[in-house]
């Protein structure tokens, strides 16, 4: 009976693997954009699997790597390609089964719970020996065809490849979430192998592609900037300013105020919904509908907006995003099934006078804010910048819908549902 249950768990896990492989998924996320951060106008509202896997989805965030791979691609005849794909699938299945059968029943149950939840609920760490090496290819038990050199995966990487991102190749492409016990540990004896405790790393090309550019002058307040709106008691003395057009924000702090590290405002088009949300914990979940959710629930806010587009986008926010303050800056993890769009002064080339809007696919993380870079961008020796408040401590995030040159929405205030994250500069 014990063996029967374990075998059933293994079969159930294999049936829950991420759909598609590299060839099947190529170009899925590119839409009309090809392979970079350009031309997402046709795909801004497309849903993706909870894992956010697939070469196409990685392509828009890791465009340079994907283009390099395509440049060295040599097409195979259909029969040859199908045979190679079938062999790779068989190898991966054999390797995965051999690894899973080494796990205890309780470990298999924890892994299955994490995989079937698709990151919608907080699941426990799955701690396994970190030195276990999985080889796929010649020399490995799973391989019979010596056509290519063997691929070696750590156990966490293998499980991420099987259950989230079939095109995953290297550990440098993933980032461990701060909620994980293995976060920040180097070569531990036991490492967490929960595939939903890692995210796909969104790397930006250098220099950034010409997508959704904004003049840096828009960072400066305009002459018709309205008066400051008095803050509520929960903002810790934060005054909120909304310059015309872009609705950018500035954080004005009372001396000695260290009660929060950022403030979050939720907007529907040009209307702010609910109060400003002060963030004191290092991690915050922002979601609309999340099982066992703990954080900023947008679904509990009272909104009078009757727009069908707003209501449609609101229903797609789902698990939303995770905002975390870490040693190197502030990271945003897209937990939803749809892309998010981010604009931040610290994501761009400091010598550029333009800002970009960056598209982040489901399952990906991006370092949305860098404190050190933000301080350097203040240009303390620049007389013009010293005379006016600066908005570089603000990040704007739109759910599902993008804005900029590739869209009819030129400004984020035209987006149905979006966030403004205002960082404490002290």
Swiss-Prot record:
Domain of life: Eukaryota
Region (Important for interaction with SMURF2): 208-217
Main location: nucleus
UniProt entry keywords in alphabetical sequence: Acetylation, Cytoplasm, Isopeptide bond, Metal-binding, Nucleus, Phosphoprotein, Transcription, Transcription regulation, Ubl conjugation, Zinc
Gly residues composition bias: residue spans: 28-39
Sequence positions that bind Zn(2+): 125, 180, 192, 197
Sequence motif: PY-motif, positions: 208-211
Record cross-link Glycyl lysine isopeptide (Lys-Gly) (interchain with G-Cter in ubiquitin), residues: 64, 70
Family annotation (Pfam families): MH1 (PF03165), MH2 (PF03166)
Residue(s) carrying N6-acetyllysine: 64, 70
Annotated PROSITE patterns: MH1, MH2
Its biological purpose: Antagonist of signaling by TGF-beta (transforming growth factor) type 1 receptor superfamily members; has been shown to inhibit TGF-beta (Transforming growth factor) and activin signaling by associating with their receptors thus preventing SMAD2 access. Functions as an adapter to recruit SMURF2 to the TGF-beta receptor complex. Also acts by recruiting the PPP1R15A-PP1 complex to TGFBR1, which promotes its dephosphorylation. Positively regulates PDPK1 kinase activity by stimulating its dissociation from the 14-3-3 protein YWHAQ which acts as a negative regulator.
Designated name of the protein: Mothers against decapentaplegic homolog 7
Naturally occurring in which organism (per UniProt): Rattus norvegicus
Lineage of the species this protein comes from: Eukaryota, Metazoa, Chordata, Craniata, Vertebrata
């Amino acid at each position: 009976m014990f063996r029967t249950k374990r075998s059933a768990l293994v079969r159930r896990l294999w049936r829950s693997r991420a759909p598609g492989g590299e060839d099947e998924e190529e170009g899925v996320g590119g839409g009309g954009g090809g392979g970079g951060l350009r031309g997402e106008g046709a795909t801004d509202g497309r849903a993706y699997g909870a894992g956010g896997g697939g070469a196409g989805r990685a392509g828009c965030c890791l465009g340079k790597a994907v283009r390099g791979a395509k440049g060295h691609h040599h097409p195979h005849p259909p029969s040859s390609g199908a045979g190679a794909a079938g062999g790779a699938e068989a190898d991966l299945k054999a390797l995965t089964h051999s690894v899973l059968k080494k796990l205890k029943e309780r470990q298999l149950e924890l892994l299955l719970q994490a995989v079937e939840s698709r990151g919608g609920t907080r699941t426990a760490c799955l701690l396994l020996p970190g030195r276990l090496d999985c080889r796929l290819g010649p020399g490995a038990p799973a391989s019979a065809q010596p056509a290519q050199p063997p691929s070696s995966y750590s156990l966490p990487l293998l499980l991420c490849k099987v259950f989230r991102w079939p095109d995953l190749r290297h550990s440098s492409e993933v980032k461990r979430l701060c909620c994980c016990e293995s976060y920040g540990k180097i070569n531990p004896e036991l490492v967490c192998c929960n595939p939903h405790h890692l995210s796909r790393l969104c790397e930006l090309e250098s220099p950034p592609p010409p997508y959704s550019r904004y003049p840096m002058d828009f960072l400066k307040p305009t002459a018709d900037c309205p008066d400051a709106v008095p803050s509520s008691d929960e903002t810790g003395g934060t005054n909120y300013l909304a310059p015309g057009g872009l609705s950018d924000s500035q954080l004005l702090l009372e001396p000695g105020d260290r009660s929060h590290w950022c403030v979050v405002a939720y907007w529907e088009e040009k209307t702010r919904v609910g109060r400003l949300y002060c963030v004191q914990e290092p991690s915050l979940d922002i979601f609309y509908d999340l099982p066992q959710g703990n954080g900023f629930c947008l679904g509990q806010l009272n909104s009078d907006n009757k727009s069908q587009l707003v209501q449609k986008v609101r229903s797609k926010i789902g698990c939303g995003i995770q905002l975390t303050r870490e040693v190197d800056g502030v990271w945003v993890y897209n937990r939803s099934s749809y892309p998010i769009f981010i604009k931040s002064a610290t994501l761009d080339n400091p010598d550029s006078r333009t800002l970009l809007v960056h598209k982040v696919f489901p399952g990906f993380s991006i370092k949305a804010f860098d404190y050190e870079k933000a301080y350097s961008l203040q240009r303390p020796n620049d007389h013009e910048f010293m005379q006016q408040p600066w908005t570089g401590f603000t990040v704007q995030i739109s759910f599902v819908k993008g804005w900029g040159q590739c869209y009819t929405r030129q400004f984020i205030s035209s987006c149905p549902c979006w966030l403004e994250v205002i960082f404490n500069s002290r």
